[in-house]
């Protein structure tokens, strides 16, 4: 679900906005068009578009936006953007070019939030300062498009696998267009204590995902 604030940097800090309930298209079966219809019939306010669903859809991004609007749905988030942060400079430039293409696609979709997953690539380095700086740079690019970045810790992330670590990077990056995405699956699968979530400023929690799955051993122990 989206915990939104205005993504327009020209208007300054936004006040509280109502929570909007959404569902990720990866959670539904069928074509993207069928998934949009199902989400609308179930009473959701919006959808999170999964990249794989868009790639296989016969509609263009702009047509997907119109179809969603016709059904009374907002495209609240586009996901996932993988293996971005904590990388060498030459790889960062490539990743920023990749991000620019995503922002252009999101503009056609009408999505204002990009979900960035913690890096799982062997190319990622264990350097929190570098990761925070690179997230700041990505958020600055997002600002230029009137968009924002929701950073999510994957339970299998190479160096960032907890919401606490993700929040430390977001706080260090200190950019208004950068916030955190909290996912119950990734938090509970590693049995992390969720009590520290109350210490994260509400305006920096950009997205909340509630997901269920069989209990598995995610730490290899």
Language-model features: locations:
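Active-site beta-loop-alpha junctions enriched in small/polar residues
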Residues: 24-28, 50-53, 80-83, 119-121, ...
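Glycine-rich, proline-tolerant flexible connector loops at the mouths of alpha/beta enzymes
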Residues: 48-69, 118-123
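Active-site acidic/histidine proton-transfer and metal-coordination neighborhood
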Residues: 5-17, 33, 70, 85-180, ...
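Catalytic domains of carbohydrate-active enzymes, especially glycoside hydrolases
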Residues: 33-53, 109-110
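Conserved beta-strand positions in the central sheet of alpha/beta enzyme cores
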Residues: 48, 77-79, 115, 150, ...
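Conserved, mostly hydrophobic/aromatic
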Residues: 39, 47, 68, 106, ...
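Glycine-enriched alpha-helix->loop->beta-strand junction motifs that scaffold or abut catalytic
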Residues: 43-45, 110, 173-179, 201-206
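Gly/Pro-rich active-site loop or hairpin
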Residues: 36, 89-90, 125, 160-164, ...
């Amino acid at each position: 679900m989206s915990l939104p604030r205005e993504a327009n940097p020209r208007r300054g800090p936004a006040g509280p906005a109502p929570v909007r309930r959404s569902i990720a298209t990866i959670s539904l079966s069928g074509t993207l068009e069928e998934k949009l219809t199902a989400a609308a019939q179930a009473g959701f306010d919006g959808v999170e578009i999964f990249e794989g669903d868009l790639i296989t859809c016969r509609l263009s991004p702009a047509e997907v936006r119109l179809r969603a609007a016709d059904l009374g749905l907002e495209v609240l988030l586009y996901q996932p953007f993988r293996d971005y942060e904590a990388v060498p400079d030459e790889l960062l430039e490539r990743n920023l070019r990749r991000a620019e293409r995503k922002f252009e696609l999101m503009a056609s979709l009408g999505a204002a939030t990009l979900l960035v997953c913690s890096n799982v690539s062997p190319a990622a380095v264990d350097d929190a300062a570098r990761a925070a700086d690179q997230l700041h740079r990505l958020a600055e690019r997002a600002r230029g498009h009137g968009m924002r970045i929701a950073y999510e810790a994957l339970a299998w992330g190479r160096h960032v696998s907890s919401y606490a670590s993700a929040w430390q990077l977001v706080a260090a990056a200190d950019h208004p267009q950068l916030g955190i995405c909290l996912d119950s699956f990734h938090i509970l699968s590693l049995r992390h204590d969720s009590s520290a979530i109350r210490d994260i400023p509400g305006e920096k929690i950009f997205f909340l995902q509630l997901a269920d799955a069989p209990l598995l051993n995610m730490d290899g122990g």
